[in-house]
């Protein structure tokens, strides 16, 4: 078999007159009565191959048997297309290849999905036949971008003198965070490894070990309920460094991300990225990952509501809640009563009891609650919300968390429905000064907002024992277009501070020692100040490639129920395998 001389998408007018050897898949076959045209595809693109009896009867006879997705080896001569046959939409659109020989390397059944960017297959079919789905150019281009992003990050971190170090996949189960995937040990009866949710502890121990600058393209595993932007196994760019301040870490990440955007996407983004405190993000956008590509910020009306004539508003404030509103500029005529009812049902999903609304017309406020506001109150509302005729005002009165969640989600929905979002923009944002702990009423205890190894502000360390809810974290999240790309923090590196953190989280001394004794001991041997960040590679590629589903950026992803439709994993194992591990199944009976 002759060697391939050209990739299909790389045959240009410079090759006219040359004999070429091409190999690829049949994208399309057209029989024009005596002539057969085939679009031959490989990962670089498509080239048109012509089978003409005047050039080769033998090749034409073979071409008559060819169907879509056959794998071919074609030998032929490159010629320029006639003036009326030029296709400027293709890189190879000014030439074609006159076939002199063709060899079918492999035949193909009719594929269950159309191998094209616009396929008609459901996602389940695409996942079952993932190897066919990956042939679509849009999929290859996504993974080419993933490669480019990873390569740029590796090159950047190399110039910054970071070492790429691999950390264990079989590790110790810890109680914080999501559920672990457990792996039984054959050697140690009744004991289990866990697959890592992140390399967090190991990268900190590398700092104890004096490596100073570490990174890893790390596989991570979390047994959690899945959403469109979650997978049970995922990849993160894991970074840790000693002796750097928070500002130095953020500056380095900004330089890295601007290079990624330029090299992988061809987009210039300016640094430094804006910074916003967590409290401000929640107050202004109702989200800890705000999409800043459009306005429509939340306005706090609690002070006004406390003295207004609308009891729903006043009672919310009196019970310790708040009233906030968003002004959908010019949207009054675009939302009917039925549409607003749909918005009301939408916010109820986030815990809101309802959605109050007003439309601003030339002669004043109109709507179900307009009668509760006199002229003075109406003017205050108009002024505070910067409202003009044609605006739609939407209010939620409830607990602070419910107001933030519901109006934050409503803001995003309206932004999409009203086409306020400039999809060409890439808005990076740092969210800083997070709360260190979050209180869970159901569990009646505090949980770490990020993880238990996050350093509090120095002046807040004592609050861990007196007022844990007030302690702030030296933590930072990187947000892009309303998606959390990753999070990081400065880390605790002193044993006494780490023990205070564990105590605030409800660990007894014995529990802390059992779970994290190795880390606590390491802190007694001269641990340097250190910090880092972990960026979600899958999500970053999803945003840069313009995809809407995380599964499109992972070669062989799982479904929303954490199963692989291609291999049918997870699956039962043989009884002998369980016996070897001294395990016995006790399955719940189906009701």
UniProtKB/Swiss-Prot annotation:
It is found in: Cytoplasm. Its EC number is 6.1.1.23. ATP binds at residues 222-224, 231, 484, 536-539. The keyword Isomerase does not apply. InterPro entries: Aa-tRNA-synt_II, aa-tRNA-synth_II, aa-tRNA-synth_II/BPL/LPL, Asp-tRNA-ligase_1, Asp-tRNA-ligase_1_N, Asp/Asn-tRNA-synth_IIb, AspRS_core, GAD-like_sf. GO terms for cellular component: cytoplasm. The record marks 84 as: Important for tRNA non-discrimination. Its main location: cytoplasm. L-aspartate binds at residues 176, 222, 450, 491. Gene3D superfamilies: Bira Bifunctional Protein, Domain 2, GAD-like domain, Nucleic acid-binding proteins. CDD domains: AspRS_core (cd00777), EcAspRS_like_N (cd04317). GO terms for biological process: aspartyl-tRNA aminoacylation. The keyword Ligase applies. Keywords: Aminoacyl-tRNA synthetase, ATP-binding, Cytoplasm, Ligase, Nucleotide-binding, Protein biosynthesis. Residues 200-203 are annotated as: Aspartate. Belongs to the class-II aminoacyl-tRNA synthetase family. Type 1 subfamily. Homodimer. Aspartyl-tRNA synthetase with relaxed tRNA specificity since it is able to aspartylate not only its cognate tRNA(Asp) but also tRNA(Asn). Reaction proceeds in two steps: L-aspartate is first activated by ATP to form Asp-AMP and then transferred to the acceptor end of tRNA(Asp/Asn). NCBIfam families: aspS_bact, PRK00476.1. This is Aspartate--tRNA(Asp/Asn) ligase. It comes from Bacillus cereus (strain G9842).
């Amino acid at each position: 078999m002759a060697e391939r001389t050209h990739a299909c998408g790389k045959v240009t007018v410079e090759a006219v007159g040359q004999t070429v050897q091409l190999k690829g898949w049949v994208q399309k076959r057209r029989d024009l009565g005596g002539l057969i045209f085939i679009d031959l595809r490989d990962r670089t693109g498509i080239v048109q191959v012509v089978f003409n009896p005047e050039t080769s009867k033998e090749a034409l006879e073979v071409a008559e048997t060819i169907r879509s997705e056959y794998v071919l080896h074609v030998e032929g001569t490159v010629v320029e297309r006639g003036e009326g046959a030029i296709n400027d939409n293709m890189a190879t659109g000014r030439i074609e290849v006159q076939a002199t020989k063709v060899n079918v390397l492999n035949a193909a059944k009719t594929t269950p999905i159309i191998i094209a960017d616009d396929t008609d297959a459901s996602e389940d079919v695409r996942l079952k036949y993932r190897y066919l789905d990956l042939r679509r150019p849009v999929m290859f281009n996504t993974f080419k971008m993933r490669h480019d992003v990873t390569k740029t990050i590796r090159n950047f971190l190399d110039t910054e003198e970071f070492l790429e170090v691999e950390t264990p996949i079989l590790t110790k189960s810890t109680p914080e965070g999501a559920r672990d995937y457990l792996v039984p040990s054959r050697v140690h009866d009744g004991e289990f490894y866990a697959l890592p949710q992140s390399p967090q502890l190991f990268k900190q121990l590398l700092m104890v070990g004096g490596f100073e600058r570490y990174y890893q393209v790390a596989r991570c595993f979390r047994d959690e309920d899945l959403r469109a932007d979650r997978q049970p196994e995922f990849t993160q760019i894991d970074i840790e460094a000693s002796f750097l301040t928070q500002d130095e870490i953020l500056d380095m990440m900004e330089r890295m991300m601007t290079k990624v955007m330029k090299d992988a996407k061809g987009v210039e983004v300016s640094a430094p990225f804006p910074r916003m405190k967590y409290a401000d993000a929640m107050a202004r956008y109702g989200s800890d990952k705000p999409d800043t590509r459009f306005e429509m910020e939340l306005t706090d009306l609690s002070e006004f509501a406390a003295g207004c004539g609308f009891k729903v508003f006043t009672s919310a404030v009196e019970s310790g809640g708040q009233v906030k509103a968003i002004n959908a500029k010019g949207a009054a005529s675009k939302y009917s009563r039925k549409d607003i009812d749909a918005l009301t049902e939408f916010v109820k999903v986030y815990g809101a009891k309802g959605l109050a609304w007003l439309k601003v017309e030339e002669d004043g406020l109109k709507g179900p609650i307009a009668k509760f506001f006199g002229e003075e109150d109406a003017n205050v509302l108009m002024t505070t919300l910067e409202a003009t005729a044609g605006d739609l005002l939407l209010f939620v009165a409830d607990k602070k968390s419910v107001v933030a969640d519901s109006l934050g989600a409503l803001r995003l929905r309206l932004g999409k429905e009203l086409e306020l979002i400039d999809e060409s923009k890439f808005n990076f944002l740092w969210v800083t000064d997070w709360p260190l702990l979050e209180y869970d009423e159901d569990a009646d205890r505090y949980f770490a907002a990020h993880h238990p190894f996050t350093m509090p502000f120095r002046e807040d360390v004592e609050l861990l024992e007196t007022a844990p809810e007030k302690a702030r974290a030296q933590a930072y999240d990187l947000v892009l277009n309303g998606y959390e790309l990753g999070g990081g923090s400065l880390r605790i590196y002193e044993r006494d501070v780490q023990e205070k953190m564990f105590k605030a989280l409800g660990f007894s001394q014995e529990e802390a020692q059992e779970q994290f004794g190795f880390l606590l001991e390491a802190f007694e041997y001269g641990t340097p100040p250190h910090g880092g960040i972990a960026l979600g590679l899958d999500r970053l590629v999803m945003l840069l490639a313009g995809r809407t589903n995380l599964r499109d950026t992972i070669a062989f992803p799982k479904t929303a129920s954490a199963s692989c439709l291609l291999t049918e994993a997870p699956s039962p194992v043989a009884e002998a395998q369980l016996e070897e591990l001294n395990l016995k199944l006790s399955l719940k009976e189906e009701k």
